[in-house]
Amino acid sequence: MIAYKFLRADGTSPFTGYRWELPKGEPGAWVEAQVDPCRSGIHGLRLGDLPLWAGRTLWEIELDGEMRKERSKVVASRGRLLHRIDAWDDDFRAEFTRMCADRAHDLANSVSPPLSNWEAVVEPSIPEGPALLSFAAARIAEEIGGPDAYHAERARQTGWLAGRLGLE
């Protein structure tokens, strides 16, 4: 299965600290681990999971072996990095963060009275990056329109990313 993975700039996982062998023209080495979501296993993302986990660098990863599809990720017993998604760079990451911040502002101000409690946290949260700002926009949508609005906002974010990154 082809999926995606966010890593730090040096190829380490932000949660485990595992340093991946980065591909150099051909796929990286296979990494194996027991499947135990959030504890062990090779965690990958489907396209719709990207806004939830948006990190520093984005990689295409091949998952194989035992697999468990979770709500916001896929966990497999084997995986290897295929290539970096070069379009996801610091400028693109900042653009996505800004888009999410602008969307959060628009949503917070779309109702009367405006949701000033949300409006006050958007700009200070920008340094935290795109995962937090995409969450804020989705939560504001949910506060206004319920769970369906949350999911619609997440789908909107996914569409924005997919279109600009050329992902399917």
Regions found by a protein language model. Give the residues of each.
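Short, glycine-biased loop/turn motifs at secondary-structure junctions and
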Residues: 1-168
